[in-house]
């Protein structure tokens, strides 16, 4: 399959059926709010390292977590009962993103959370399209995660933990928020054993896209806002 080169300032994507076997769909473009929201609406996300062009992915299968499927282990239940952590939402978004990047770098893994990515997701958060869920202990940020929120879907990006179970508690906080606020799907993007143990599972990309159509609003440029309507997604 070819890899498509995106046109700067033109926030459209090829259909995800054109993605390579590894999920890579396109290269280039920008990290504007409009393009990022359009990407997530259509099952696409950016993932690249410093020095690379922006790479856009849509893997098949897709790892998802439905709020009702969350699995909380016995040890995590014990941590939650002890109330070791205080849960907060959006109180330190930029710090959570920084900590996610620093955690990967400290492990020698490299990171896709570049400075441009940090700025882009910060802009999304200020516009209401991104959130952080945080675990605090003794006045310090102990763990957390950040995600994109569009319509009735969360799109998980990254998580970190400086203390035992802190990121898991943040995920529990996210799921509780989802249950209370009508969020039906949490996109975990790519398989990890950690999330599988907590109830996530893989589904075919085709099914994932069908669910996005029902749960994510379409963009109406004339009104400059997102609303639910019946227009098909570009990536279907």
Annotate each predicted stretch with a short phrase:
Residues 1-236:
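N-acyltransferase acceptor-side catalytic subdomain
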């Amino acid at each position: 399959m070819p890899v498509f080169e995106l046109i700067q300032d033109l926030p459209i994507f090829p259909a995800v059926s054109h993605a390579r076997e590894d999920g890579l769909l396109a290269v280039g473009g920008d990290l504007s709010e409009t393009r990022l929201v359009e990407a997530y609406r259509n099952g696409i996300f950016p993932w690249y390292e410093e020095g690379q062009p922006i790479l856009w992915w849509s893997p098949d299968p897709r790892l998802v977590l439905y709020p009702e499927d969350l699995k909380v282990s016995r040890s995590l239940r014990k941590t939650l009962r002890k109330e070791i952590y205080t849960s907060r939402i959006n109180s330190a978004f930029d710090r959570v993103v920084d900590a996610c990047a620093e955690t990967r770098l400290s492990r020698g893994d490299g990171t896709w959370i570049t400075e441009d990515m940090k700025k882009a997701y910060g802009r999304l958060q200020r516009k209401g399209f991104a959130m952080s869920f945080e675990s605090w202990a003794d006045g310090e940020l102990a763990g957390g995660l950040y995600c994109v929120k569009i319509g009735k879907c969360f799109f998980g990006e990254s998580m970190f933990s400086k203390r035992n179970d802190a990121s898991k508690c943040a995920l529990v906080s996210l799921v509780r928020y989802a249950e209370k606020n009508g969020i039906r799907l949490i996109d975990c993007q790519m398989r990890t054993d950690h999330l599988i143990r907590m109830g996530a599972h893989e589904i075919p990309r085709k099914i994932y896209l069908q669910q996005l159509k029902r749960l994510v609003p379409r963009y109406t440029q004339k009104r400059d806002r997102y609303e639910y309507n019946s227009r098909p997604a570009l990536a279907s």
